[in-house]
C-alpha cells in the first residue's frame, strides 16, 4: 500500500512538473497598435520604429520584430501594428526599464519621444498582451519567397460570447488540432495567442501569411473544403464558441524583420 501511494505521488509530481514546464515554455507577445490620422504622423512613427525602436529591441535581445500596416478606410485612419515576441512575461517586464537606460535609443528616438502635445505622433496607441497557445508555444517566421511588398499577412481576432465559450474555441485550436490543420495546409502562421489584456476580450488572435492575394484565396478555399475541417466544425462540443471574427489584411513595412 505504501509503495503504491509513493508511486502515485511520484506520478502526480511528475505531471505537475511537466504541466509547469509546458506553461513556462510558452512565449508571451505584445502587439502595439498605433492609430494615425495624418501622413506626417505615419512618417514620424515609421522613422521612430525604423531608426530607434527596432534597433533598441535588437540590442535588448529580441531578434525578430514584425511591423505591419492596415489602411482602415472605414475608420478613416491608418494603423501600424508592431508584433514583439518575448520568451516570457518576465522578459517583457524588463524591456521598458532597459529602454529608459538605453542612451542610444533616447538619442535616435528623440523626435518621437520628445514630441510636443500639439504635434503628437499618433492619435492613440493601444497595447495587446497575449499568451502563446499550448499547441504552438513559439512564434514562427514565415517561409515565403515573394518580396515583402507582395505578401499578405492576415490578422484574425476571434471574440468569444462568454469566457467559457472562448476557452472552448481555444481548446478547438489546441486539443481539436485546428492548429494542425493550418500547419498541414501551409498557412505559415506566425503566432496563435490568447489575449490576457486588451480592449476586446475574451479574445484570441492569430496571424497567417501568404505569398500574395491569390495565394491567400487558394489556401482558404482548401481550408473550407478540407474533410477534417468539416468534421471538426460539425462536432457538437465546438458549437457557438465565437461571437465575432475581425479579419484584417495587412501589408508589411519595408523595415520589418519578417
What is each of the regions a protein language model found here?
Residues 1-25:
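Bacterial Sec-dependent N-terminal signal peptides
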Residues 20-106, 111-229, 239-258:
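Short S/T/G/P-rich N-terminal loop/turn motif that feeds into the first structured element of a domain
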